[in-house]
Amino acid sequence: MGVLDRQVSDTQIKLRSRLWLYIFSVVVLFLLIVPSMIVIPMSFSDSQYLEFPPKDWSFRWYENYFFSWKVENGFNDWMAATRTSLLVAVLTIFVATPIGTLAAYGLANSTSRLRAVLFPIMISPMMVPIILVAIGLFYFYVQFKMVNSIIGLVLGHSLVAMPLVLIIVMSALKNYDMNQEKVARSLGASRPRAFVEITLPQIKFSLISFLTSFDEIIISLFVSGGANSTITRSMFLALRDQIDPTIAAISTILIITSSGLLIVSQMLGSKSQ
């Protein structure tokens, strides 16, 4: 029996029957990953322009990023933009995560007919084109003078991150036995305490909103600027107004950081299970 004729599962499906699916998956992964990976060697180029493949290798653009605070022109202060993005992303965690988690918990335990109505409303920011959300936020913030403010950025990013948290937590709760919480309550624990000590630890690794906020660009373009410009907004403007290879260095750092956080999250999630 050849390798392609071996059974893939107990349903008698053979590897040959799925070969086309594996090939298609490899092609899709290639098209998704390779364009992102090209930016990595470009970040080590010594050229003044984005160049692939690099003719000469250098760390000059990483140095330009980490020491950009020494540049008098605020447009090139990448570190200030990075600090703003980190601050907004952390604050978004404390806004979007509790709201999304409690909403998911309430919907998962609800037997009301309103559940079918509330869920689409809560995930509507994901369904509506993000450009429309950004325009709406801009005109709303103008009325309250919240444009270019940290609070405005946090609320805007939370609006986008909350539906993602809601969906992920609801998915995690489907695999969670709610009887564990009922047992805790029968032993004298209050409902909030049972949720915090029994339910929350088993779904905590499904709570992600940091990366959603850190990578967000559309809302940032409309409601941030000046001293409160985010790193993604600064990258977009630099790519539009000038060819700065520092963007490739920052992109490489973001790719490595995001991938590392996702891997750690998956490892911790698997370990907790």
Name each model feature, range by range.
Residues 3-14, 89-122, 135, 139, ...:
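Transmembrane-helix boundary motif in ABC transporter permease subunits
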Residues 31, 92, 99, 122-132, ...:
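Faces of alpha-helical transmembrane segments in polytopic inner-membrane proteins
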Residues 34-37, 41, 98-102, 118, ...:
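Membrane-embedded alpha-helices of multi-pass transport/permease systems
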